């Protein structure tokens, strides 16, 4: 489903450098936990990115936090990967706090089709034009597309015409795109 988590990993940045990677998080029902050695730096958590993002390799290459924030994720054949990301500034947390909740956010945008008309409507196909094919892994302060991101049209043809509202028609890279049609 849309909110399904298949894998989860995290990384810690201290003084602008990636210093730790966490890939085997403890899971209980719908929550994951990890133990931190100290309460400093910024913790980032990713879900459903294990096949896309190699945190260990990034750490070994000496990745800076600024490089991390500029990391992009790309659509494959017009399909954006369904991932989640979250961020927690540990320096801002109250001292003595042992459990720190982090909410993960969807890293993609969802298109829903809502049909509103006075008569009957049936839709056989839909084309989304000029979709950006990359987005930032970690949400920026405001939604924006990576510079130079490829664009592509995405067409949906339905075996049976759509006759009613359809949720989750398309999942695309998060973007600001005045050319999207």
Language-model features: locations:
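Tryptophan-paired
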Residues: 2-59, 114, 119-181
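Short strand-edge motifs at loop-to-beta-strand transitions and within beta-strands
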Residues: 30-32, 98-102
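Structured interaction patches on ligand/partner-binding surfaces of diverse proteins
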Residues: 51-98
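Secondary-structure boundary elements
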Residues: 90-96, 104-110, 114-125
């Amino acid at each position: 489903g849309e909110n399904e988590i298949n894998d989860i990993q995290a990384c810690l940045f201290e003084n602008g450098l990636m210093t730790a990677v966490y890939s085997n998080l403890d899971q209980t029902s719908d929550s994951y936990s990890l133990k931190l050695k100290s309460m400093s730096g910024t913790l980032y958590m990713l879900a459903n990115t294990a096949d896309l993002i190699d945190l260990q390799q990034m750490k070994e290459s000496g990745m800076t936090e600024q490089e991390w924030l500029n990391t992009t994720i790309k659509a494959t054949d017009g399909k954006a990967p369904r991932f989640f990301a979250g961020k927690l500034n540990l320096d801002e947390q109250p001292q003595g706090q042992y459990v720190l909740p982090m909410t993960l956010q969807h890293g993609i945008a969802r298109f829903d089709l809502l049909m509103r008309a006075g008569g009957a409507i049936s839709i056989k196909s839909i084309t989304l034009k000029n979709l950006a094919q990359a987005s930032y892994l970690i949400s920026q302060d405001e939604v924006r597309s990576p510079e130079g991101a490829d664009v592509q049209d995405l067409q949906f043809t339905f075996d049976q015409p759509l006759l009613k509202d359809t949720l989750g028609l398309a999942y695309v890279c998060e973007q600001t795109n005045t050319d999207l049609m």
